[in-house]
């Protein structure tokens, strides 16, 4: 009887370890960090806005959808952002550092993704009065894992084109304008999401069934009903 109980306890401990290991593996695969760059819209040229984006970003997969969390500095200059038509959801702010972290729903973690940014500056920059008010398209180049798929579909943005020339407070063009376009590029079809692997759900069920079987066996053995 003592030997049976030892085997029973050992198997229970093993099941707990297996379940914990698979759960941690699944969670680890559903979040992480990714490096990225901000390009001028529909080009491979680095945008002037790139320096205002802290790297790396963080990605999360939840409920079958992909999200990236991006932190910007000079936060009060950046009055609005969107990625694939999905507006930012601010999740944290650091007033002292003038930073904020925003979450966006995305269709993939690797490759180019279109976004928009609104910038408004009306203060002294390098000791001189400076005024800058612009809304323009940009392209994010994500360098994250390509094997993490989501079911996300690009959202619809109410503005498809950027505004006119960037101008400083003296009315002269600043030379910092981004490439503007009124035509939307086609967005790649997101990969079909397979959801959480089936074995993640199967393991607890199989473990429970095994636990019940062992319990019944031990009870029968203690009563002398096992042949």
Swiss-Prot record:
Residues 161-172 have a biased composition (Low complexity). This is Iron-regulated surface determinant protein C. Residues 173-182 have a biased composition (Polar residues). Involved in heme (porphyrin) scavenging. Binds hemoglobin and almost exclusively free-base protoporphyrin IX. Probably has a role as the central conduit of the isd heme uptake system, i.e. mediates the transfer of the iron-containing nutrient from IsdABH to the membrane translocation system IsdDEF. Hemin-free IsdC (apo-IsdC) acquires hemin from hemin-containing IsdA (holo-IsdA) probably through the activated holo-IsdA-apo-IsdC complex and due to the higher affinity of apo-IsdC for the cofactor. The reaction is reversible. The keyword Metal-binding applies. Monomer. Interacts with IsdA. Residues 1-28 form the signal peptide. It is a peptidoglycan-anchor. It comes from Staphylococcus aureus (strain MRSA252). Residues 149-191 are annotated as: Disordered.
């Amino acid at each position: 009887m003592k030997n049976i109980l030892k085997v029973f306890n050992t198997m229970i401990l093993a099941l707990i370890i297996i379940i914990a290991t698979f759960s941690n593996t699944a969670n680890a695969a559903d979040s992480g960090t990714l490096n990225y760059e901000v390009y001028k819209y529909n080009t491979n040229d680095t945008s002037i806005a790139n320096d205002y984006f802290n790297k790396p970003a963080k990605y999360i997969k939840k409920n079958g959808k992909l999200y990236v969390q991006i932190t910007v500095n000079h936060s009060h200059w950046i009055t609005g952002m969107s990625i694939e038509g999905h507006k930012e959801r601010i999740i944290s702010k650091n007033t002292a550092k003038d930073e904020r972290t925003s979450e966006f729903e995305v269709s993939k973690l690797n490759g180019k993704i279109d976004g928009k940014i609104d910038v408004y500056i009306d203060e002294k920059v390098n000791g001189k009065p400076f005024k800058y008010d612009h809304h323009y398209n940009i392209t994010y180049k994500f360098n994250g894992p390509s094997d993490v798929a989501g079911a996300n579909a690009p959202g619809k943005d109410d503005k498809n084109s950027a505004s006119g020339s960037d101008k400083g407070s003296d009315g002269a063009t600043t030379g910092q304008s981004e490439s503007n376009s009124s035509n939307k590029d086609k967005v790649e079809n997101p990969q079909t999401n397979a959801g959480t692997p089936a074995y993640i759900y199967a393991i607890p069920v199989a473990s429970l069934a095994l636990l019940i079987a062992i319990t019944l066996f031990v009870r029968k053995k203690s009563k002398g009903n096992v042949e």
